[in-house]
Amino acid sequence: MTDWPVYHRIDGPIVMIGFGSIGRGTLPLIERHFAFDRSKLVVIDPSDEARKLAEARGVRFIQQAVTRDNYRELLVPLLTAGPGQGFCVNLSVDTSSLDIMELARENGALYIDTVVEPWLGFYFDPDLKPEARSNYALRETVLAARRNKPGGTTAVSCCGANPGMVSWFVKQALVNLAADLGVTGEEPTTREEWARLAMDLGVKGIHIAERDTQRASFPKPFDVFVNTWSVEGFVSEGLQPAELGWGTFERWMPDNARGHDSGCGAGIYLLQPGANTRVRSWTPTAMAQYGFLVTHNESISIADFLTVRDAAGQAVYRPTCHYAYHPCNDAVLSLHEMFGSGKRQSDWRILDETEIVDGIDELGVLLYGHGKNAYWYGSQLSIEETRRIAPDQNATGLQVSSAVLAGMVWALENPNAGIVEADDLDFRRCLEVQTPYLGPVVGVYTDWTPLAGRPGLFPEDIDTSDPWQFRNVLVRD
């Protein structure tokens, strides 16, 4: 595609925080799809490598870390420079999403991020209990800010591939499933209507089911963590507690599972790191696989969004929802090495598009427990297709950067929506913008269940009355 649409004009400054793998991939999409004054675009990152890359693209660059102490002094002049509404694109680690979001809104600037990120030190603070380090707790801080200051300038929270795009996939998958099950009616337009549809369809749960098969042209070196996206981000979330949205149909809970005393009540966490917690899941390419139950915002937000409550406010329906992530093989080996040694590797490396020889990132949602058993809907984006349609990123990165693009388009078209999550956005508009960057987007039914081939040669603690119980999904051997 050579005739790319220019969606809108951004009249004010564009301030991009972070220029790692996602920032470098997002910048060319901003340049391609928006009209703006190039002199008003600035990138902020503490890395000298990032400075060289930004300057090579002719972009103004500030080599500085955004911290709790300097963020106001640094960002306010940039976001308010000259006429027009500013746009803050926060793609960094170790910067408080909430603080920067509120600062942007105070100054009338639009805002978007891909995660509810805390300030540096939060993830590895030994004084914080597991519950305090959870994504549930981080999300609740954003929800509290929305309650305290409803409406106002739009800020889109958690709008990458996942969290983000997968929330739009869930809605499309529900629409497809309804059609295939012969359930008629108007397409939902409210949260309550979407939740009722999921309940009426009998969806017991949703896996964010992903398989990354991208391979490098060289073997993983010893004591180097290799991944296809931010190693810092993956390690940080991987060492948070495993978390999931907890469905109303579940009859068993792990002994080390804990709930929350406040907030939406949609999630639980386990007293173990997500990147060392395995679950059984399925994607079209790998088919049955083990994935890591890494905590993600969408595990809680989707479960919360699809909750049906009675007149007394009690949840009568909620699907279980969690990530089931099989990263690239080098990252799996890196996790094994990290947990085995009991410490982080001395170095890390993000595989870029020039180092990957082949593979896809197959990322979608697996809706299960309904009348057709299980339905996977998602993107099968290859590295070859990625190179053809977008510069400076691999397949994993493009699924994220194109979701940021879609969220920016939605924010510009809805500039006074207040604080929103990806679940709140118009999924059709967002997928209209994003789909050209996703490769094949497919829906596949499967008769696989977590009880396939079980029990095997050894006795297992399983629930044969309901294959989709979390008791059967969680790998406990």
From Swiss-Prot:
Subunit (UniProt): Homodimer.
| Family label | Belongs to the saccharopine dehydrogenase family.
The protein's required cofactors: NAD(+)
Keywords, sorted A to Z: NAD, Transferase
Q: Is-annotated flag, keyword NAD?
A: yes
Documented EC number(s): 2.5.1.44
Which reactions are catalysed by this chain? Answer: 2 putrescine = sym-homospermidine + NH4(+); putrescine + spermidine = sym-homospermidine + propane-1,3-diamine
UniProt keyword Transport, yes or no: no
Cited Gene3D superfamilies: homospermidine synthase like, NAD(P)-binding Rossmann-like Domain
What is this protein's record name? Homospermidine synthase
Top-rank taxon, per record = Bacteria
Q: Which organism is it from?
A: Blastochloris viridis
Q: Which gene encodes it?
A: hss
InterPro entries noted in UniProt: Homospermid_syn-like_C (IPR023181), Sacchrp_dh-like_C (IPR032095), Sacchrp_dh_NADP-bd (IPR005097)
**One GO molecular-function entry:** homospermidine synthase activity
What job does the chain carry out? Involved in the NAD(+)-dependent synthesis of the polyamine homospermidine from putrescine.
